[in-house]
Amino acid sequence: MEMTNAQRLILSNQYKMMTMLDPANAERYRRLQTIIERGYGLQMRELDREFGELKEETCRTIIDIMEMYHALHVSWSNLQDQQSIDERRVTFLGFDAATEARYLGYVRFMVNVEGRYTHFYAGTHGFNAQTPMWEKYQRMLNVWHACPRQYHLSANEINQIINA
């Protein structure tokens, strides 16, 4: 992350104020203030994660994934024979915190801040699937989009989607 000295000074002052406003996280803000003031390039890359960007297309894809899981669960709930498909298979897991942190952050934002998909169970890890999921979800979306009735899926269609 490239910053001018003036930008670094402003950000340093912001962290100093946050230290006073949020004593519970003061140590974290002091650390970030030191990194900014001294210009530690390696550690400044951490800020890229905090101030990163998700393109509109990516945000829409994540919402589409969440909508697919909503449709899967609703369709599963309407099945005559729910025993043929384990409910956990139609439950949204989230994304991997280690490799898909920005996606995970967006999911948490959508649920906790925007109030969408609040019926999704975050689990003990807060939608951290603990394994990369993006490619799996892409395959699932391709199958789901090919279904003629995306919100009234048959057991066969549900199985095709979750096994994609």
Curated annotation (Swiss-Prot):
Top-rank taxon, per record: Bacteria
Protein name (Swiss-Prot/TrEMBL): UPF0304 protein YfbU
Gene3D superfamilies in the cross-refs: Helix hairpin bin, yfbu gene product, domain 2
SUPFAM superfamilies the UniProt entry points to: YfbU-like
Stated family: Belongs to the UPF0304 family.
